[in-house]
Amino acid sequence: MANVGKVVQIVGAVLDVKFDSEQSLPNLLNALVIKLGDKEIVAEVAQHIGDDTVRCIAMSATDGLVRGMEVVDTGGPISVPVGDETLGRIFNVLGKPVDGKPAPKSAPKLPIHRPAPAYDELETTAEILETGIKVVDLLAPYLKGGKIGLFGGAGVGKTVLIQELINNIAKQHGGISVFSGVGERTREGNDLYGEMSESGVINKTALVFGQMNEPPGARMRVALTGLTMAEHFRDEQGQDVLLFVDNIFRFTQAGSEVSALLGRMPSAVGYQPTLATEMGALQERITSTKKGSITSVQAVYVPADDLTDPAPATTFSHLDAKTVLSRQISSLGIYPAVDPLESTSRILDPSIVGKEHYEVARGVQSILQRYKELQDIIAILGMDELSDEDKLIVARARKIQRFLSQSFTVAEQFTGNPGQYVPVKETVRGFKEILEGKHDDLPESAFLFVGTIEDAVRKAKGSM
C-alpha cells in the first residue's frame, strides 16, 4: 500500500508534508509525488523536522498547490533514464523529455543519488585529452578523466568554448558527451541544440536542462541528472565520456537559495553552510575508473570577477586544470580569450606531456610574463627605450599572443572563417619555431586566427 501524507505548509519551493506516524516517514532524498490535475509535482525530502513531518524541495513550480493535498512517497530517490536511448534527446531534471518526442520506452532507470566509485575501482594513470585548441593543449592540457574549470566573467566566451570542445571531441574522438545546463539561459540551450543538430554532433550527446526560470530545486539537482547518465556510459559501456556543466556556479547559487528556504544559518557571503559537502558529493563521482572515464568541463561564473568568492574558490580545490578567460585579452580581439599566464594544469609535467612540450610551454609563458612586466615601461617611455634583447622579446611575445588565437568551427557562421583543429604535435612545433626565432621576419598580423605555423607563413606571403 502506498505511503501517503498531506501538505501542511507551502513556502515558495519548500513544502512541509505530514505523515501518519514516524514509521511511515520517507527517507531523506526520497522523491514524493503530488498530483495536480493532469500534472505531477515531484519534491525531494530534505529534512525531518519532527512531529511526523518532512520538509521537501519541489522540482517544479508550486503554483496551484494547497494545504491538505495528498502526497505519495515513491520509496526511492528521483530516477532518470540512462543508456543509448538518451542520445540526441533533451531531458529535464526528472528525466522527462522536453523536446516534444515520446519518452524512452526501454531505457533503464538509475537514481540520481549514488555513491562515488570505491578506491579500488579508480584508474590512476594520467593521459592527455587532445582538444585541438592550441592555447589549451599547449599551456593547460586537459587530463583524461579529469575535472576542468572554465573561469570567466559575463560575455568572455565560456559557452562558445564549451560548444567547440563538444564539436571537436565528437568529431575527432567519436566520444559521447552529456551536457548539463544548470541555471543558464534557455535561449542558449535552444541555440546549442540547433547548432548540434546542424553539425551532426547531437547523435552523440544527451542534453539535460534546468534553466534560469526553474525553481532552485531543479537547478540544484540537474547536474546530478546529467552525471548519472554519464556514469552509465562509463560503467556499463566502458566509454570515455565528456560531461559539460554550464554553469557550476548556478549549482551553488541554487543550493544557497534552497538552504535559506530550509532555514539553515548562512555562512560566508550568504552561502549555504554545506557548500563544500554539496560540491564534494558531486565532484567525487566525476572520475576515471578501470572501466572508463568521465572528463568534466565546468564553466564557472566568477561573481564580479572575484576569484576569492566562496563559490569559485570551493570549485578550485576539485580541479585538475583551469582555463581562465580574460576580459583584457578579449578586448584585444584575441579569441579564445584564454589567459595564458593564469590558466594552469596539473599534468603540464615532463613525465606526462613529454620534455619538448613542457619546455616549449614554459618558454612561451616566460616570454609572455616578461612582456607583461615591460608593458609599464613601454606605456611611459615607449618602445625606443628598451634594449635590443627586450625589443626582440616584445616582438616574439606579440606573435605568440596572436598565434594563441584560433578560428572556431561553431563560430564560423559569425566570423566567416572556417574552424581549425590543430593536433598537439603541430601546436608544440609551431610555438617552438617562434621561440627559436625562425619567424622573426613575419608581421605579427600573420599569426592572428590561423591554425598551424604553415598557415601563418602562407598568410604573410598572401598579404605581401
From Swiss-Prot:
Catalytic reaction equation(s): ATP + H2O + 4 H(+)(in) = ADP + phosphate + 5 H(+)(out)
Membrane topology qualifier: Peripheral membrane protein
Organism for this UniProt entry: Clostridioides difficile (strain 630)
HAMAP family: ATP_synth_beta_bact
Family listed: Belongs to the ATPase alpha/beta chains family.
Protein name: ATP synthase subunit beta
Lineage: Bacteria, Bacillati, Bacillota, Clostridia, Peptostreptococcales
GO cellular component: plasma membrane; proton-transporting ATP synthase complex
Cross-referenced PROSITE patterns: ATPASE_ALPHA_BETA (PS00152)
CDD domains, sorted: ATP-synt_F1_beta_C, ATP-synt_F1_beta_N, F1-ATPase_beta_CD
Domain of life: Bacteria
Subunit architecture: F-type ATPases have 2 components, CF(1) - the catalytic core - and CF(0) - the membrane proton channel. CF(1) has five subunits: alpha(3), beta(3), gamma(1), delta(1), epsilon(1). CF(0) has three main subunits: a(1), b(2) and c(9-12). The alpha and beta chains form an alternating ring which encloses part of the gamma chain. CF(1) is attached to CF(0) by a central stalk formed by the gamma and epsilon chains, while a peripheral stalk is formed by the delta and b chains.
Pfam family, one: ATP-synt_VA_C
Keywords carried by this UniProt record: ATP synthesis, ATP-binding, Cell membrane, CF(1), Hydrogen ion transport, Ion transport, Membrane, Nucleotide-binding, Translocase, Transport
Residues that bind ATP: 152-159
Enzyme type, top EC level: translocase
Gene Ontology molecular functions: ATP binding; ATP hydrolysis activity; proton-transporting ATP synthase activity, rotational mechanism
Record gene name: atpD
